[in-house]
Amino acid sequence: MAGVLGSVVFWLIIGIHVTFLVFAQEGDHFVYYDFRNADLELDGMANTNHGPLHLTNNTNTGTGHAFYNIPIKFTASSLSSFSFSTEFVFAIFPLQKSTYGHGMAFVVSPTKDLRSNGSANSNLGIFNRANDNKTATHIFAVELDTNQNSESFDKGGNDVGIDINSIVSVESADASYFNARKGKNISLPLASGKSILVWIDYDGIEKVLNVTLAPVQTPKPDSPYFSSFIKPKVPLLSRSINLSEIFTETMYVGFSGSTGSIKSNQYILGWSFKQGGKAESLDISRLSNPPPSPKRFPLKEVLGATISTIAFLTLGGIVYLYKKKKYAEVLEQWEKEYSPQRYSFRILYKATKGFRENQLLGAGGFGKVYKGILPSGTQIAVKRVYHDAEQGMKQYVAEIASMGRLRHKNLVHLLGYCRRKGELLLVYDYMPNGSLDDYLFHKNKLKDLTWSQRVNIIKGVASALLYLHEEWEQVVLHRDIKASNILLDADLNGKLGDFGLARFHDRGVNLEATRVVGTIGYMAPELTAMGVTTTCTDVYAFGAFILEVVCGRRPVDPDAPREQVILVKWVASCGKRDALTDTVDSKLIDFKVEEAKLLLKLGMLCSQINPENRPSMRQILQYLEGNVSVPAISFGTVALGIPNISHETVTQMTTTSSSANFSFEDVTVLFGGR
């Protein structure tokens, strides 16, 4: 009898112990293998009917949440209380072979009710437009993202990210695990239908968060086999972060998943959590089995679902077209008329590595320009207009309208654009050699431009201006021609860029006078006096540009000797003495004398005070190609519009002026000799 009683007691103890392993819970730690009796609060699509925690199913645009019912207490006076450790096994089954739904996340939240906070699709059922990126949200999540989207800016559709109060991850990486034998990370498809282990460990004292992944052995072992045996030594993500600034005193832990137009079944097969220490290792042999793959539906049900879907899409299309027509004027009409490719913000964010400073190519009056690389490998330059730029939108519209359809080998091509939440971004061809200004005036280049390279650049810019003035369907006035706006490609060909001040108009229509904009030294007399902008004002600026390239000097240089401060005036004085070539850049030892004289005289012709006496861009190109001889100005007189700039203006010049603090003097120059 005693033996029987002892046996009963023994098996009773074992039963209690096993029950504890299957469903062990206290306020600060618990382990679940079968979720049917787990102390969880479920909403949305989430259910535990078959043992595993089933977060999402084959429902479109839905969410599923599951939170441990007992709150976790985090005490501000004890940093160790913020330490926690959790591990869980998940499996995601896509309903279509190549599409994977939107993913899931482990969440620590001040509330168990995320139904009003979290939207579906790319927000993973956690965030929405109202609470995204708000410090008052107090949400921490580790996301397992299985679908590339334009909201979260993470990796490319199979990544793990750390989210703090926003769907935009503070750190993310392609899903993978460290293989010690191979000494490298091995890619790990998240939506493969296979079981995957995740460890999330946070040290509240050191303030370090580690996220580690590993595949689970299949089929399950018959005897106990613990997760600690397969945990990689190197975490996938490791980040210093102070969660005491994020967590409130009471938080809930759980999971969130979502679907959009793409559906998937998401399961949690086992879960262990502990506050203030290491979570109990999961026994792989005790994990819940994921259900079999979804069954094929009878033809009748398939047809019914298809008809319903078509009806829904048709109705949605009608509503979309109705709203599109109703709000057409709100959608910016110019965007339809001038429509280069539109990029998602996520793609540009990835391409520029989050607009990091080490990707910065330069900054101007309206914004910063960053280098980027698209997924295709194409290098781009992304101009991001400042939020507080008063003319930001106006400049953006001008560049889109002007550049979107312009095509010329000597123009920097606008590849596309992006508008998101007030952000203005323009995407251009990347010019690996930077601006011409860098080569002419900065010593950080490996070598100077040769004479033939400079001549080729001048001809290229002239060809681009001829296209803008005469060959495109409208007249395009660039209004800011200068060396810093000429970019150089890999072969050092010059390309005209930065259309931020550009204006375009139909042929035969004269533009009204406008506010004076441009750069000192490049602005024609009639522009500064009356605000008149024509192709002749572009020609005047091109003349200043020619002299700038040939002489290696800026049109106005406050650091030059007094007689050389105004470049066109100095060239004129040298012309009087039959010494034009004395003005050629001293770094050029291989220049061709006659070619240099032609360019200098052409620059002077473009600088005449009377716009009617300046040549057109077509004539200029004919002079440059040698098809027509330059007028014999060396034997006549030329009235030049030379800036009469005060010393104060010279020393306080700005790159782009809204007003011109100088006048022009009519100087008659007599050229003699060669």
From Swiss-Prot:
CDD domains associated with the record: lectin_legume_LecRK_Arcelin_ConA, STKc_IRAK
Protein name per Swiss-Prot or TrEMBL: Probable L-type lectin-domain containing receptor kinase II.1
Cited PROSITE patterns: PROTEIN_KINASE_ATP, PROTEIN_KINASE_DOM, PROTEIN_KINASE_ST
Residues holding ATP: 361-369, 383
A GO CC term assigned to this protein in UniProt: plasma membrane
Annotated segments matching region Legume-lectin like: 28-274
SUPFAM superfamilies in the cross-refs: Concanavalin A-like lectins/glucanases, Protein kinase-like (PK-like)
Entry's family note: In the C-terminal section; belongs to the protein kinase superfamily. Ser/Thr protein kinase family. In the N-terminal section; belongs to the leguminous lectin family.
Ranges facing Extracellular side: 25-301
Main location as per UniProt: membrane
Catalysed reaction equations from the record: L-seryl-[protein] + ATP = O-phospho-L-seryl-[protein] + ADP + H(+); L-threonyl-[protein] + ATP = O-phospho-L-threonyl-[protein] + ADP + H(+)
N-terminal signal peptide: 1-24
Subcellular location: Cell membrane
Keyword Kinase: yes
Catalytic machinery residues: 480
Membrane topology: Single-pass type I membrane protein
TM region(s), chain numbering: 302-322
Pfam families the UniProt entry points to: Lectin_legB, Pkinase
Residues of this chain annotated as glycosylated in UniProt: 57, 117, 133, 185, 210, 242
Broad EC category: transferase
Native organism taxonomy: Eukaryota, Viridiplantae, Streptophyta, Embryophyta, Tracheophyta
